[in-house]
Design a protein with these regions (language model features):
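An N-terminal assembly and electron-transfer interface module characteristic of large anaerobic redox
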Residues: 1-226
């Protein structure tokens, strides 16, 4: 399909149409947060490293790239309509992406796609529940896992979405919870500070970093310091 990008008036005046050109996948995750998308990428990679070779394929996209109606229509045509499950984590409710939600809901109903829309601000939203096609109990589990953050919770959320879409996903092992404080090392991952300290008599340097590095599974900069 060819998309002609021309000057337009009245349609998201500050936005320019974008063709993400994503190939179809089993599951598609959309969010305005790069931290969300980074965690889901790490969660999917975790599934693969645990020899889940048949784990569903995924595509990740930032909703900031899908603000223009042409961008939405193109992404639906190329990617979303071929998916088995779609998860959207939205901040601000329906008004922040009303055209996209309406169009994706229609395509999900037409193609029997498991469609979940969850709020990213920690509050319940009945409008998003009504737009979604999966049970409210599934929405709450997905919301809880996304609010926890980190690669294990993201792995679990992907598995939950896969099951809702009728795809196979193995049970997810490992602790999903992330404490408000704690320790992390490349060797032990999340752990008790006493374990991180170990019994090595050599002096150690304490590196302090934000918890959000863990919830976004963005630990490469920290790991590089070890």
């Amino acid at each position: 399909m060819h998309v002609l990008f021309v000057e337009r008036h009245g349609l998201e005046e500050t936005e320019v149409p974008v063709d993400l050109d994503h190939q179809p996948a089993d599951l598609v995750i959309l969010s305005f947060s790069d931290s969300d998308l980074g965690a889901f990428a790490a969660g999917w990679q975790r599934a693969k490293t645990q020899n889940e070779h048949d784990f569903p394929s995924i595509r990740l996209a930032n909703l900031a790239s899908l603000k223009h109606p042409i961008s939405v229509d193109t992404y639906i045509e190329k990617t979303l309509r071929h998916a088995s499950g779609i998860l959207i984590r939205l901040i601000g409710g329906v008004p922040y992406w009303s055209y996209g939600l309406n169009q994706v809901a229609q395509i999900a109903k037409r193609h029997n796609i498991a469609f979940a829309v969850i709020p990213a601000d920690g509050r319940s939203d009945k409008q998003l529940d009504e737009i979604s096609s999966v049970p409210v109990s599934t929405l709450r589990r997905l919301q809880h896992l996304c609010e926890i953050g980190g690669e294990v919770a993201a792995h679990s959320a992907l598995a939950q979405l896969a099951l809702a879409a009728g795809l196979y996903a193995s049970p997810v092992s490992g602790s999903k919870m992330i404490g408000n404080v704690g320790a992390w090392t490349p060797e032990h991952n999340l752990c008790c500070p006493f374990i991180a300290r170990g019994f090595d008599p050599k002096p150690l340097i304490l590196i302090t970093f934000y918890r959000s590095f863990i919830t976004a599974a963005d630990l490469k900069p920290i790991s590089a310091l070890f």
